[in-house]
Amino acid sequence: MAKGIREKIKLESTAGTGHFYTTTKNKRNMPEKMLIKKFDPVARKHVDYKETKLK
């Protein structure tokens, strides 16, 4: 079976709360790091989430 091109990543909150989301991304279409605005339930507002490596 062929290995998939999608890689698992972690989106970590820039608010410093320690909250994170996990998702996948296609490395061929998006080689740069992602920066997405999502809801942080700890801070109770929308903040930027930066891509980090999933350990």
Curated annotation (Swiss-Prot):
Keywords on record: Ribonucleoprotein, Ribosomal protein
GO annotation (BP), single: translation
InterPro entries the UniProt entry points to: Ribosomal_bL33 (IPR001705), Ribosomal_bL33_sf (IPR038584), Ribosomal_zn-bd (IPR011332)
Recorded GO CC terms: cytosolic large ribosomal subunit
Molecular-function GO term, any one: structural constituent of ribosome
The keyword Ribonucleoprotein is assigned to this record: yes
Family listed: Belongs to the bacterial ribosomal protein bL33 family.
Name of the protein in question: Large ribosomal subunit protein bL33
Protein species of origin: Bordetella avium (strain 197N)
Lineage: Bacteria, Pseudomonadati, Pseudomonadota, Betaproteobacteria, Burkholderiales
Gene symbol of the encoding locus: rpmG
